[in-house]
Amino acid sequence: MRCCICKKEIKGYGNNAFPAGNSTCCDECNIKVVVPYRLLLRNCEKEDTALLVTTNELKLVKPKDKYFTLKELQEAVNGYIELVSEVLPNFLTVVNEEGLIRKYKFNELAYHLFGLEVYGNALIVPKKIFEKPEDD
């Protein structure tokens, strides 16, 4: 049996991949993708941000202060930022504007979870911490 996320052969029994997939995943994808994704969805009202890395890993990250700075967003996606489709309510999706031009690796995880055709890392950021409001 193959992992529904990374497509590698599953050793042992496997894990329930929901909500990251509709079948079984390997232990590595369970730890690096499924559990963090469940935590993100469970804490949607909080300020968790998902960094979808091209190594098939979902990392929960936070800004250094209350809001993300442009520099932090650029560091997360390794370059100029671009906002793309909203994949979760009240979240913005930040990607590298030049990911394809710079020949970054296709982000299989962003495609698998959200149907995003992204090259390089993707960041799923709650709107409320995306940038500092002018009146704050």
Tell where the protein language model's regions lie, with residue ranges:
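Short metal-binding segments enriched for Cys and/or His
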Residues: 28-43
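Helix N-cap / beta->alpha transition motif
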Residues: 13, 26, 36, 96-97
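Short Cys/His-rich Zn2+-coordinating modules
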Residues: 5-14
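Intrinsically disordered, compositionally biased terminal peptides
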Residues: 1-2, 40
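Short cysteine-rich clusters marking metal-coordination/redox-active sites
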Residues: 3-6, 26-29
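Short beta-rich binding modules
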Residues: 39, 43-136
